[in-house]
Design a protein with these regions (language model features):
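Beta-sandwich strand segments
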Residues: 206-208
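Transmembrane alpha-helices
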Residues: 1-148, 176, 210, 220, ...
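USP/UBP deubiquitinase core
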Residues: 136-203
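Non-catalytic accessory segments adjacent to catalytic cores
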Residues: 214-216
C-alpha cells in the first residue's frame, strides 16, 4: 500500500509541477509585458526583472488551488486512461483508499502554499512594490484615511522610507468642523510622529485664522509597522498583519471588512484546495476512459475559475447583506465537497 501512495504521488507531483510551470510562465510573460512601459520611461531591464522575480512567491500562492486542481485531473487522468485505476480497483484497493493516497500527495502542496503565503510571499511582495516604486518614481501607497477620536486624517501617500506625504487632519466636534491641519510631511522619530511644514486653519469669531509652524509632535496611535500593511493589497498580507490591522480599524471605528475577508480567505485556502482536489478525483472516477487530456484541463480551469468567481462574489456580498465572511468563503468549499461525494458515490 505504501508503494501505491508513492506511485500515485509521483504522477500527481509531476503533473502539478508541469501545470504550475505553464501557468506561472504565462503569467510572468504577461506581467513583464505590462511593465515594458517603464523601460521607455528610464527604468532598467534589471529593475523590472527584479520586480517580476520578487512577485513569483505571491503568484505561486495565488495559483496553487487552480494548479493543484488541474494537476490532479491530469495526473489521475493519465492513470485512468492507462486503465491503472481500474487495475487498482480490481486488485481490491478501495476507492476511499485511493482518495486518501491522492490527498496525502496533495498535502505537500497545501502545506508548501500555506508556508509560502504566510512567511515568504508577503515579504517578497513588499520588496517588489518598493522596487517598482523606485523605478517608477511614485509613492509607495495610494491615499488612505484614518480616524483618531474626533480627528479624520487623510495621508496622500507614503514614501518607501516610511515618510508620510501631504497629511491632512480634519477635527470635528458635535458634527461641526473645528480645525484643519495640513502638513507637508510626517516622520516617525523616536517613539512619536512629527509633522513638518504645516498650516493650521480654524474659525474664531466668524473669522478664518491661519497659522504656520515648522514642526509639531503629532499624538496619533498609528504605528510605522502598519504603514507596510496599508501599502499592500489585503490579499497579499500575512494572517498576523490582517488580524493586527483589523483590530486597529475596529478601535478607530473604521470599516475592516476588506481585511476580514482576506483573513478568512487565507485561513480557508487549504480547505479550498483540498475541496477542489476532491472534485478532481470525483470527475476522474465518474467519467469514462475516453475523456482526453484537453477536456480534463478545460474542466479543471472552468471549475477553478468558477470557484474563485463565486468566492469573489460572496465575499463582498457578506458585507452588504450582513452575513459572516466565514460563511461566504466556506459555502463554495462545502458545495465542492458535497458535489464530489455525490459523484464518487455514483462511481461506486
Amino acid at each position: 500500500v505504501r508503494l501505491l501512495d508513492i506511485y500515485i504521488a509521483r504522477h500527481i507531483w509531476a503533473a502539478v509541477a508541469i501545470v504550475l510551470l505553464v501557468i506561472l510562465g504565462l503569467d510572468l510573460m504577461t506581467a513583464l509585458g505590462s511593465e515594458l512601459d517603464a523601460l521607455d520611461n528610464g527604468a532598467s531591464f534589471k529593475q523590472v526583472l527584479t520586480y517580476i522575480v520578487l512577485t513569483v512567491p505571491r503568484r505561486v500562492y495565488e495559483f496553487m488551488p487552480l494548479t493543484v486542481l488541474v494537476g490532479c485531473l491530469v495526473g489521475l487522468g493519465a492513470l485512468a486512461n492507462n486503465s491503472e485505476l481500474t487495475v487498482m480497483r480490481a486488485a481490491g484497493i478501495s476507492l476511499r483508499r485511493i482518495v486518501w493516497s491522492v490527498m496525502q500527495a496533495v498535502a505537500v502542496f497545501v502545506l508548501a502554499a500555506a508556508i509560502l503565503g504566510e512567511f515568504v510571499a508577503p515579504v517578497s511582495q513588499k520588496m517588489a512594490e518598493i522596487e517598482q516604486t523606485q523605478y517608477k518614481g511614485a509613492a509607495s501607497t495610494k491615499g488612505f484615511w484614518l480616524r483618531e477620536g474626533n480627528d479624520y486624517i487623510f495621508v496622500r501617500s507614503v514614501k518607501s522610507d516610511g515618510v508620510l506625504q501631504d497629511v491632512s487632519r480634519y477635527r470635528f466636534a458635535d458634527n461641526n468642523w473645528q480645525q484643519t491641519l495640513v502638513a507637508k510631511t510626517g516622520e516617525y522619530q523616536g517613539s512619536q510622529w512629527t509633522l513638518k511644514q504645516l498650516q493650521t486653519v480654524w474659525l474664531e469669531d466668524q473669522i478664518i485664522v491661519q497659522q504656520g509652524q515648522d514642526d509639531m509632535v503629532w499624538p496619533v496611535s498609528l504605528k510605522p509597522n502598519l504603514l507596510s500593511i496599508l501599502s499592500m493589497d489585503p490579499q497579499h498580507l500575512a494572517i498576523e498583519d490582517l488580524v493586527e490591522y483589523s483590530e486597529y480599524l475596529h478601535q478607530s471605528g473604521l470599516d475592516a471588512a476588506p481585511y476580514e475577508l482576506a483573513f478568512w480567505k487565507k485561513i480557508l485556502q487549504p480547505l479550498a484546495t483540498l475541496s477542489l482536489v476532491f472534485v478532481a478525483i470525483s470527475f476522474v472516477f465518474g467519467s469514462t476512459r475516453s475523456v482526453t487530456l484537453g477536456q480534463r484541463v478545460l474542466v479543471g480551469v472552468l471549475v477553478g475559475l468558477a470557484f474563485n468567481y463565486v468566492q469573489e462574489v460572496l465575499g463582498p456580498a457578506s458585507s452588504v447583506f450582513g452575513f459572516t465572511p466565514l460563511l461566504a468563503y466556506l459555502m463554495p468549499i462545502l458545495v465542492c465537497v458535497a458535489g464530489g461525494a455525490w459523484m464518487l458515490r455514483k462511481a461506486g
